[in-house]
């Protein structure tokens, strides 16, 4: 399963991403409430339908704040250039068996690859 970051969704809505369409069709896409929340803060066409569709996807395991703080310490993420929500997404992937994070955020991708948690799709 692939946890899709907001950067992938935004690019998909700008110009259809066939890789994402294939993953959705195969039932391989995970959502996360923080990604849905970030997207909800944007200007969405067909807002309610989009948010409902995201909420209807299988959801990644949500890490507690304590789990994320431990994850940050255990993986030396301080000073890595990622944000707290990014750390939450990586922790969620770690907690969701068989999942990977798909992002176009360069720093998040680099950390995800280092930790073996990133989906390295060819862009």
Task: List where the protein language model places each region.
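Short, well-structured N-terminal submotif of metal-dependent ribonuclease cores
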Residues: 1-34, 40-52, 58, 117-118, ...
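Short, histidine-centered active-site or binding-site loop motifs used for metal coordination
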Residues: 34-35, 72
